A protein has these predicted regions:
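C-terminal motif of bacterial Sec signal peptides marking the signal peptidase cleavage site
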Residues: 35-38
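Bacterial signal peptide processing site
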Residues: 40-42
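Conserved hydrophobic/aromatic beta-strand scaffold that supports enzyme active sites
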Residues: 114-118, 196, 230, 261, ...
C-alpha cells in the first residue's frame, strides 16, 4: 500500500510522512497492578481523588470493561511459568515468573503486515508520563515516574513505552478529545463518554467509557488518559470506524496516516496497535483479532506514533513500529508529548 501524500497540519504538529511501506504493530500489555517505581523526595505524590467530569454533545453506548487488580505480595509464590508458549506466538521477553512479552504476525486484506506484541497480565505495571510541552502542567510538582523523561530507577524496570493520545484541545469536532489526570492531578477535566485508560497508584490498569458505569464506584483513580469515543466496544468494532474524519485530522487531509491505539482484553492484557500508514478500521480489526474488549485511538500522524520494547527489564530498547520517526531511546532522553511506560513487576 502506498502512503497518502501528507503535509503539515495546523492542528497536529507532524513531520513529513514516512517513505517506506508501513507495517502495523499491536502491543498487548498485561495490566495487573504492581508497585510503580518510588518517587523522588522532591516530588511528593498526590493521593488518588474523585475527579470532575464534563459532558460532550454526543452520547455513546458504554462498552464492556475489564479491570485488573493488584496482585498480593504478602506471600510471594515461587517462580513459575504462568503463561506457556502458544502456537503461532514467539516469545520476546521472559521473566522468572513467566512470559512477559510474545508476538504474533498476520497480514491484513490490503497486504499490510500486522504484528501483535502481547504483554501479559500479572507481570507488568504502568506509569503515565507528561510531555515537556503537552499537556501543560502549570508548574505542578509531579513524581519522577510522571515526568517527561524516564529516570534511572524506572529504566531498570522498563519493558516498553508507547505514545499517548491527542494533543489537549485538538481532535475531531464536535466529539472533543477528552481530559487527562496524572499522579492525582487533573490537568484537563475528564469528559463523560470518552474512552479512558485508568491507572491506579500501584500501576494497575483498566479501561472503559468515562461516566458510563466506569470507573466503578470506589475505584482508586490515580492517572487517566482519554481520547475520543471507543474504537472497540464490547469486543466489536465501532460502527463509526468508517468515518475517517471522526478519528482526527491527518496531514494533508488524506485517509492514510500513522495511527496508534490502545485496548484491553478479557484477561487484563493491554493491547497497543500502530502503523505508519493505516486507517482506523485496520487498527480496530487488529485489536479485535487480538481479543480487545475495549479500545481507543491514541495519537496519529508520523511525528507522534512510537513504541519501543526491551528483551529484558532495563535492556536495550528497540523500535517496535517499523519506520517510526523517533529513535528507540527517545523517551529516555525526554519527549514533548505524553507517553506510557510498561514496567516489569513486582
Amino acid at each position: 500500500m502506498l502512503m497518502a501524500r501528507q503535509h503539515l497540519s495546523a492542528r497536529l504538529h507532524g513531520r513529513r510522512p514516512a517513505r517506506h511501506r508501513a507495517v502495523s504493530i499491536v502491543l498487548a500489555l498485561g495490566m495487573a497492578g504492581v508497585a510503580v517505581a518510588a518517587c523522588s523526595s522532591s516530588s511528593p505524590v498526590a493521593a488518588p481523588h474523585n475527579v470532575t467530569t464534563t459532558t460532550p454533545r454526543p452520547a455513546h453506548t458504554a462498552p464492556s470493561t475489564t479491570t485488573t487488580s493488584r496482585r498480593s505480595t504478602a506471600t510471594p509464590s515461587p517462580p513459575a511459568t504462568t503463561t506457556p508458549e502458544q502456537p503461532g506466538w514467539t516469545v520476546v521477553s521472559r521473566l522468572p515468573s513467566g512470559i512477559a512479552v510474545d508476538s504474533h504476525s498476520s497480514r491484513r486484506s490490503n497486504g499490510d503486515l500486522v504484528t501483535v506484541l502481547r504483554f501479559h497480565a500479572g507481570l507488568v505495571h504502568y506509569a503515565l508520563h507528561v510531555g515537556s510541552i503537552d499537556p501543560p502542567t502549570d508548574g505542578a510538582a509531579l513524581p519522577a515516574v510522571a515526568r517527561p523523561a524516564i529516570g534511572a530507577r524506572e529504566h531498570a524496570q522498563l519493558l516498553a513505552a508507547f505514545n499517548g493520545g491527542f494533543k489537549m484541545g485538538a481532535g475531531c469536532i464536535p466529539c472533543g478529545v477528552g481530559g487527562m489526570e496524572v499522579a492525582g492531578r487533573v490537568l484537563f477535566p475528564l469528559v463523560r463518554g470518552m474512552t479512558s485508560l485508568v491507572l491506579n497508584q500501584s500501576g494497575g490498569a483498566s479501561m472503559g467509557v468515562w461516566g458510563q458505569g466506569f470507573p466503578p464506584a470506589g475505584a482508586a483513580v490515580y492517572s487517566v488518559r482519554q481520547t475520543l469515543p471507543p474504537l472497540v466496544s464490547g469486543g466489536r468494532v465501532s460502527p463509526n470506524v468508517g468515518d475517517v474524519s471522526a478519528w482526527g485530522a491527518t496531514l494533508g487531509g488524506g485517509l492514510l496516516t500513522a495511527r496508534s491505539s490502545v485496548g484491553i482484553d478479557a484477561r487484563g492484557n493491554v493491547l497497543y496497535a500502530a502503523s505508519m500508514s493505516t486507517l482506523p478500521s485496520d487498527l480496530a480489526d487488529a485489536l479485535v483479532s487480538a481479543g480487545a474488549v475495549t479500545a481507543m485511538e491514541l495519537d496519529i500522524n508520523p511525528e507522534w506514533v512510537q513504541a519501543d520494547t526491551a528483551r529484558s527489564p532495563g535492556g536495550p530498547l528497540r523500535t517496535a513500529v517499523p519506520y517510526q520517526y523517533r529513535p528507540a531511546d527517545q523517551y529516555l532522553s525526554g519527549w514533548t508529548r505524553d507517553f506510557v511506560t510498561v514496567l516489569s513487576g513486582p
